[in-house]
């Protein structure tokens, strides 16, 4: 019995080695290329002459919306038979384009089919969808949700004008124009863009605004906001996260600084600061007993305030007890920036070159 078992093991081992050798021969004689071709995901290209609304229904793909090279709208993506990425379903009705995920069916036909699709992904992107909008055309509305809420660039909008948005994703805008709407962002960045009549909730994440204009915009619940060469029009309100040590860095273009009303304030809240640092107490004496050495705590508290530098040094900061305020009044101007915060560092200065 043992002899038969030994023979069976030897035969199995030899067969395995032979299989690996044959697979290697196939690999080095072009078999792997053929495997890629057979198992490649299906590329989908759709063209439309007229669209006014785009709805993207909670897909796991990154979305890239950009300017088209011709007068048509184009949608490009790839579906995989083996559903390593949930396949997409596309529908269009009366100018409304809808993208949604199909139910996964897992049609894997053996390890070689799976391997082939993995290899094919080197040249066919199954993780993103591209939507192209003709130059000079304006989308009436863009609605969308992404599974990759905190990922940089899960929604990229470039060289496109949109009248209204309703988005929940990580957002990157490049030379984009948004006229109205609401955005819930795990990450938000706008470069050379214009935002109007828009509310942004940053979910305690980062907001970056570079050479961008805000007009009647509210941005709330961010952890860090960096704005360089910012243009302010109309009434704009920034409200950082209340329960952490937030940072707001602002640098306005000269024209905006000369024509703006500023109302900036931050309040030191010891209890909230202590909770952010992991301490819970009822009295200040209890906090001192819990912390022991208060030097680190005091160092963090010193970061709370309004700080000016460069062209902003002439602006006066009023300090009273645990509150600091900076007010600049231009009665003839309709432009204003209001920042109301707790336990925040607010810097008005020209960014240091990297």
PLM segments and residue spans:
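Positively charged n-region of N-terminal signal peptides that target proteins for export
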Residues: 1-5
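Hydrophobic membrane-insertion alpha-helices, especially the h-region
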Residues: 7-26
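Glycine- and small hydrophobic-rich membrane-insertion segments that are intrinsically disordered
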Residues: 27-35, 109-119, 288, 293-305
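Short linear S-[DN]-x-LW-Φ motif typified by the pepsin-like aspartic protease active-site region
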Residues: 31-102, 109, 119-177, 182, ...
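Short, surface-exposed interaction patches in beta-rich subdomains
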Residues: 176-181, 186, 190-354
């Amino acid at each position: 019995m043992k002899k038969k078992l030994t023979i069976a093991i030897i035969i199995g081992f030899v067969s395995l080695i032979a299989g690996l050798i044959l697979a290697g021969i196939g690999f080095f004689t072009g078999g792997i290329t053929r495997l890629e071709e057979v198992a490649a995901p299906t590329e989908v290209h759709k063209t439309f002459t007229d669209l006014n609304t785009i709805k993207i229904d909670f897909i796991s793909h990154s979305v890239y919306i950009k300017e088209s090279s011709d007068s048509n709208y184009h949608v490009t993506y790839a579906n995989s038979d083996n559903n390593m990425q949930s396949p997409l379903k596309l529908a269009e009705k009366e100018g409304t384009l809808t993208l949604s995920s199909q139910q996964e069916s897992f049609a894997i036909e053996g390890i070689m089919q799976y391997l082939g699709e993995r290899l094919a992904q080197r040249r066919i992107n199954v993780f993103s969808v591209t939507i192209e909008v003709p130059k000079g055309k304006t989308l009436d509305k863009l609605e969308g949700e992404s599974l990759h809420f905190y990922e940089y660039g899960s929604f990229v909008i470039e060289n496109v004008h949109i009248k209204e948005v309703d988005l929940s994703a990580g957002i990157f805008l490049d030379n984009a124009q948004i006229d109205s709407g609401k955005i819930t962002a795990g990450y938000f960045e706008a470069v050379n863009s214009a935002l109007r009549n828009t509310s942004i909730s940053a979910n305690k994440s980062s907001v970056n605004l570079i050479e961008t204009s805000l007009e009647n915009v509210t941005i709330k619940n961010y952890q860090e906001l960096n704005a360089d060469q910012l243009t302010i029009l109309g009434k704009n309100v920034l409200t950082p996260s209340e329960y952490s040590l937030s940072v707001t860095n602002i640098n306005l273009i000269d024209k905006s600084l000369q024509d703006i009303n500023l109302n900036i304030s931050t309040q030191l809240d010891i209890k909230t600061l202590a909770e952010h640092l992991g301490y819970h107490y009822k009295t200040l004496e209890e906090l001192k007993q819990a912390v022991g050495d208060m030097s680190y705590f005091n160092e963090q508290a010193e970061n709370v305030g309004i700080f000016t530098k460069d062209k902003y040094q002439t602006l006066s900061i009023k300090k009273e007890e645990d509150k600091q305020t900076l007010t600049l009044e231009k009665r003839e101007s309709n432009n204003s920036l209001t920042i109301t915060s707790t336990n925040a560092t607010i810097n008005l200065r020209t960014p240091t070159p990297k």
